């Protein structure tokens, strides 16, 4: 795994070695020390201290460790955690998730050994004493929407309370690629970050080229069934519905955006019957406590077209939900899954191979064909290709 050794001052490892040799020669001459001292810059001083300055996506100037000094990183949420471990899991200083055994099976080795230190997501808290005791050197905060003044205040407070630099990153859907490049540069993982960014850009461009020109009246209608009874959903305005829109679906959920901060707007069964979607994507009943089996088997749902046609699909959830939570890079696999499922003739890919590729690149987990098919569940093979 290659690392980037360039500092903010523009000194590479090679030029630093050359500089060191020249400095040693100069110091052997009378008066050289004062000459050298007079030439040192603020950036140069920071470099020798193992520090550099970056301007984060909130416009904040943050002093952080240079890549050669960076060993332990934490994050304010599971969303940011995925960026860190997908780039360099050995730099992860703890966990913002409490993973199940099923989720751990698809994650880098050693994840189960890391301490859970909390998360600010969903109004949660981070254990600040543990954060400092574990010698965390840097914290990433990644936002799935535009960074707000409240977000900035929260990160400033965290930085002030702990003395640990906090870097804020815009991780909104179309900025995921740039977020990877920015974080990768800070972590000394520019080559790997570029590989992931290019991969995501390729997925997005290919899917949009395949489904982006479908007129609204010809789009497949879809209902996203959340919660234990399937009677919560996400309207188009919700960030949790973004994957469906990008994949060319016509989201039928004509409900207000939830003000809870968690999504999941309430829906009545009568409304779903009236919308009569062609496809339903539901949470699974085992991992997420969803209503996929209820929807498939209950007489109350049987009048809906998606149920009658056998087009109720369970969203894969291990180690993360493919379409929405967290709203991060996992959505790019969901983008492929939904586009291929709704429009197999337009977006004709082998989802078994795509799942294997994604898990290998992003999660460091090489899975078999059977494991990929197990994750895909009843959506493999896609409807329309049976």
Predicted segments — roles?
Residues 2, 6-28, 36-82, 191-224, ...:
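Bacterial Sec-exported substrate-binding components of ABC uptake systems
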Residues 59, 117-127, 257-269:
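Short helix-initiation/N-cap motifs at beta->coil->alpha
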Residues 101-103, 123, 144-153, 167-182, ...:
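Extracytoplasmic ligand-binding site segments that recognize negatively charged/polar headgroups
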Residues 174-180, 185, 198, 288-386:
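Structured C-terminal subdomain patch of bacterial secreted/periplasmic proteins
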Residues 237-262:
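Alpha-helical, coiled-coil/dimerization segments enriched in small aliphatic residues
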């Amino acid at each position: 795994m290659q690392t980037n050794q360039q500092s903010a001052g523009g000194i590479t490892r090679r030029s630093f070695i050359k500089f060191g040799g020249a400095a040693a020669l100069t110091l052997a001459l009378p008066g050289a020390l004062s000459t050298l001292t007079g030439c040192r810059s603020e950036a140069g001083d920071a470099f020798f201290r193992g520090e550099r300055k970056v301007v984060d996506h909130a416009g904040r100037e943050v002093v952080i460790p240079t890549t050669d000094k960076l060993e332990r990183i934490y994050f304010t949420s599971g969303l940011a955690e995925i960026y860190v471990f997908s780039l360099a899991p050995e730099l992860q200083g703890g966990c913002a998730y409490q993973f199940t055994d099923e989720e751990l099976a698809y994650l880098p080795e050693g994840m189960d050994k890391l301490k859970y230190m909390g998360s600010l997501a969903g109004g949660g808290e981070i254990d600040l004493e543990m954060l400092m005791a574990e010698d965390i050197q840097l914290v990433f905060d990644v936002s799935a929407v535009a960074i707000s003044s409240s977000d900035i205040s929260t990160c400033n407070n965290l930085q002030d309370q702990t003395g640990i630099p906090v870097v804020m990153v815009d991780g909104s859907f179309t900025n995921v690629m740039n977020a990877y490049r920015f974080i990768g540069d800070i972590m000394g993982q520019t080559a790997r970050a570029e590989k992931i960014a290019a991969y995501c850009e390729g997925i997005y461009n290919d899917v949009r080229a395949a489904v982006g020109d479908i007129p609204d009246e010809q789009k497949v209608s879809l209902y996203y069934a959340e919660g234990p009874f399937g009677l919560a959903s996400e309207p188009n305005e919700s960030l949790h519905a973004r994957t469906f829109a990008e994949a060319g679906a016509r989201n039928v959920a004509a409900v207000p955006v939830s003000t809870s901060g968690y999504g999941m707007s309430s829906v009545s069964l009568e409304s779903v019957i009236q919308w009569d979607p062609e496809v339903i994507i539901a949470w699974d009943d085992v991992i997420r406590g969803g209503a996929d089996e209820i929807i498939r088997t209950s007489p109350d749902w049987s009048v809906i077209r998606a149920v009658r046609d056998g087009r109720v699909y369970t969203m894969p959830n291990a180690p993360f939900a493919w379409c929405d939570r967290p709203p991060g890079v996992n959505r790019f696999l969901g983008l492929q899954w939904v586009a291929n499922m709704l429009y197999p003739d337009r977006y004709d890919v082998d989802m078994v191979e795509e799942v294997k590729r994604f898990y290998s690149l992003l999660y460091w987990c090489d899975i078999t064909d059977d494991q990929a098919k197990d994750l895909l569940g009843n959506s493999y093979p896609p409807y329309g290709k049976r």
